[in-house]
């Protein structure tokens, strides 16, 4: 009888841990300051894939705030990275998701080998110096804070119109195991 109770407790504990583990692996929707930073630098540098005008007032605010920085040294540097290393499209976001900011400066949180292969030609420390120069000179964190209400409204709309209908239990059903990664929609 004692063995049965211990086994039952163990199985209950295992089930609870599995539920916690799966909850941690659920897809989270969030706004990211570093994703916005990299997108806006790319837009300011004229990357066509980042110049779509479908953001309404936010696009207008971006143009108003950052248009004075079109000749900024970081913007010129990013244009050179596109020309010489092919940093564009998904490579921009590959870097963005490996960055972190504390509101004062931007830091690299990954390993260079984690980045999209086009970044292998880039000196990351030099890139960070330039990125932080843009971040500081443009008062990017202030811009980001001023648009929190907009980001929250977009996240809420996404939750209500997409995530509400997205069945996240497909992963273990398809692969046969629980995901061990963190999935984020940024």
Identify the residue ranges that each predicted region occupies.
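Bacterial Sec-dependent N-terminal signal peptides
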Residues: 1-28
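Acidic/His-rich structured neighborhood in mature extracellular/periplasmic domains
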Residues: 71-186
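N-terminal mature-domain "stem" immediately C-terminal to a signal peptide or N-terminal signal-anchor/transmembrane
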Residues: 26-106
